[in-house]
């Protein structure tokens, strides 16, 4: 079943794949990495002016990585704002996605966390560096194929 936004994107010749609806009835779309920045700008102009959240996950060991964006169209006088979920899948060998920082500034720390934990590089992000782990940390801790390094914690140090 095609949702309202998917129908609008088809009407305007914008390539995407409908993934259906989640349990709350929110339309979910898959966008190719190379198309994401231009479609993000179009969605902003269309009225999706609020980025509720961005997260990322490892789909399967050795498989794809996904960056997920939850967008909301907030308008005055509307009790139930329109929401959409966008998923961008990338290869773990070269996980690069255009940053949407210049569209929604609120994605700043969220893209940095996705970079820090999964190694997804967000092109044109102004401050893409580790945010939770030390800069010297090797690897991407939330990848399913990540092997934790051997280290010993000093217990009861006073």
UniProtKB/Swiss-Prot annotation:
The keyword Cell wall biogenesis/degradation does not apply. PROSITE patterns: COMPLEX1_30K. It comes from the Eukaryota. It is an enzyme of class 7 (translocase). It is found in: Plastid, Chloroplast thylakoid membrane. One of its GO terms (biological process) is photosynthesis, light reaction. It catalyses: a plastoquinone + NADH + (n+1) H(+)(in) = a plastoquinol + NAD(+) + n H(+)(out); a plastoquinone + NADPH + (n+1) H(+)(in) = a plastoquinol + NADP(+) + n H(+)(out). PANTHER family: NADH DEHYDROGENASE [UBIQUINONE] IRON-SULFUR PROTEIN 3, MITOCHONDRIAL, NADH DEHYDROGENASE UBIQUINONE IRON-SULFUR PROTEIN 3. NDH is composed of at least 16 different subunits, 5 of which are encoded in the nucleus. This is NAD(P)H-quinone oxidoreductase subunit J, chloroplastic.
